[in-house]
C-alpha cells in the first residue's frame, strides 16, 4: 500500500465560521483505504498557515507505506530541519498527518486505533462541560452566550448539570463586569482587588449552584502570570477547585514551578506545549500535575501516547485538550481509551453545538456527561458530506 495524495480542507461551519475554521487532511492510498487527521489551529490566528504547512509536509510522505507510522513520524521530525524544534503550525500539520496515518492503519487491520496503542482500558470516559463563561446553550444554538454576572455563571453551570455533567470548567476572570473581554495587561502582575473580587463572586455563585460534589476546573488561558495567578489561586482555594489551568505561560518552567509550589491546587497545562521533549522539564520539576496535550498539535496519536507515558512516570494524569472538529474529538477518545493515567475528557462548548457535530459523519455527543469510545476501525470518524461540500479544498499528489 502506498500514499498517493493528500487532500487538505479548511472547514466552514454553518455558524461562527471565522471563529472556528477547522483544518483537516485526508490521506489517500492506492487501495480503497484513506484516513483523516486534524491540525489544531482552528481558533486564534494561524489556521491557514496550518493548512499550507500540511501541503509543505506532504512530499515527505507521498509514495510511502502509510503503515510505517513511526518511521514517517521520524522523517517529518528529522528530515525537515525545522521539525526538531517546531512550533504550533509545524507540529499541528505533523499531528494531522500522523492522525490520518493511524486512521488508515486501524482500518487496514480492522481495529479501532486504541488497539494499536495498547488496547482499551475503558468503554466510556467521564467528561466536563468546558468554557461556561461562553455559555452552555442548547445544542441547536447558533452562537455563544457570554456570562457576566454571578447569576449568569450559576445559570450556565446549572444548564450543564441538567445534561448529566458532574464536572465543569470556567474562566471566571476573562470577562469584565461590563461584559467585555478584559485587556491582557490588566491581568498581569499584582492585579486590582476588583478583578479578584469579581472572579470570586462568580465562582462562589457557581459553587452554590452546583453543590459540593461537582468538580470545578478554573481556566486562566495563560492571561495571568506568575504573580496574578498565585494571587488569584490563593483566593479561590477555599472553593475546592479540581485543578487550575494555564495559570502561567507555557514557556517558563520556573514560573510554573513557583505557582505549583505556592498554591494548594493541582496545576494543569499543555495545549500549547508540543512533543515529549517540551513536556519533560515541566514534569521533572512537578510544575504540572495534569497534562493537557492537544492531540492535534502535540505530534498526533503517536506522540500523544508517548507524552501520556512520560507523564505516568511522574504520577501526572492526563486530560487531552479538545477544541476542534469531530476529527480531533474522535482521535482524542482513542487515546483516552487506552492510557492508564486518564483523568477526564474535555467537552468544549464549541463541540456541543450541532453546527460543529454535523461536520462529522458520526454524531459524537455526550450521554449524561460521558462519551462512549468509538468502536469503528481507525479513529471512528470522517468528514460529513456537508463538511466536504462547504470546505475550501486543495490536493497534493
Question: Which positions does each model-derived feature cover?
Answer:
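Ligand-binding pocket scaffold of soluble enzyme catalytic domains
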Residues: 29-31, 36, 68, 108, ...
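Metal- or metallocofactor-binding catalytic centers and their adjacent structured scaffolds
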Residues: 28-109
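Metal-dependent enolase-superfamily TIM-barrel catalytic cores that perform enediolate-based chemistry
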Residues: 124, 129-257
Amino acid at each position: 500500500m502506498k500514499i498517493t495524495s493528500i487532500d487538505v480542507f479548511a472547514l466552514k461551519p454553518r455558524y461562527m465560521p471565522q471563529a472556528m475554521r477547522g483544518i483537516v487532511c485526508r490521506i489517500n492510498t492506492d487501495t480503497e483505504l484513506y484516513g483523516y487527521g486534524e491540525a489544531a489551529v482552528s481558533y486564534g490566528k494561524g489556521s491557514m498557515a496550518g493548512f499550507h504547512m500540511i501541503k509543505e509536509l506532504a512530499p515527505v510522505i507521498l509514495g510511502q507505506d502509510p503503515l510505517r507510522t513511526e518511521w514517517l513520524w521520524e522523517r517529518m521530525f528529522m528530515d525537515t530541519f525545522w521539525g526538531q524544534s517546531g512550533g504550533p503550525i509545524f507540529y499541528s500539520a505533523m499531528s494531522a498527518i500522523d492522525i490520518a496515518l493511524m486512521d488508515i492503519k486501524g482500518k487496514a487491520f480492522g481495529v479501532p486505533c486504541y488497539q494499536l496503542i495498547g488496547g482499551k482500558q475503558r468503554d466510556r470516559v467521564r467528561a466536563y462541560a468546558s468554557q461556561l463563561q461562553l455559555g452552555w446553550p442548547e445544542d441547536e444554538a447558533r452562537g455563544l452566550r457570554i456570562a457576566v454576572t454571578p447569576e449568569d455563571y450559576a445559570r450556565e453551570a446549572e444548564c450543564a448539570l441538567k445534561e448529566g455533567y458532574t464536572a465543569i470548567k470556567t474562566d471566571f476572570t476573562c470577562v469584565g463586569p461590563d461584559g467585555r473581554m478584559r485587556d491582557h495587561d490588566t491581568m498581569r502582575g499584582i492585579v486590582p482587588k476588583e478583578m479578584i473580587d469579581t472572579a470570586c463572586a462568580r465562582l462562589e455563585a457557581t459553587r452554590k449552584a452546583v453543590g459540593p460534589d461537582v468538580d470545578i476546573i478554573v481556566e486562566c488561558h495563560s492571561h495571568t502570570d506568575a504573580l496574578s495567578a498565585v494571587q488569584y489561586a490563593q483566593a479561590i482555594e477555599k472553593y475546592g477547585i479540581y485543578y487550575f489551568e494555564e495559570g502561567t505561560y507555557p514557556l517558563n518552567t520556573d514560573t510554573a514551578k513557583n505557582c505549583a509550589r505556592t498554591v494548594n491546587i493541582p496545576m494543569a497545562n499543555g495545549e500549547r506545549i508540543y512533543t515529549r521533549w517540551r513536556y519533560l522539564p515541566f514534569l521533572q520539576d512537578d510544575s504540572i500535575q495534569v497534562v493537557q496535550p492537544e492531540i492535534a498539535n502535540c505530534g498526533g496519536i503517536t506522540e500523544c501516547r508517548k507524552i501520556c507515558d512520560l507523564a505516568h512516570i511522574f504520577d501526572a494524569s492526563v486530560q487531552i485538550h479538545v477544541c476542534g472538529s469531530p476529527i480531533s474529538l474522535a482521535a482524542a477518545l482513542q487515546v483516552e481509551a487506552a492510557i492508564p493515567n486518564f483523568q477526564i475528557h474535555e467537552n468544549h462548548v464549541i463541540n456541543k453545538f450541532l453546527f460543529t457535530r454535523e461536520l462529522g459523519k458520526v454524531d459524537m455527543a455526550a450521554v449524561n456527561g460521558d462519551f462512549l469510545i468509538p468502536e469503528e476501525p481507525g479513529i471512528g470518524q470522517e468528514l460529513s458530506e456537508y463538511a466536504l461540500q462547504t470546505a475550501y479544498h486543495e490536493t497534493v499528489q
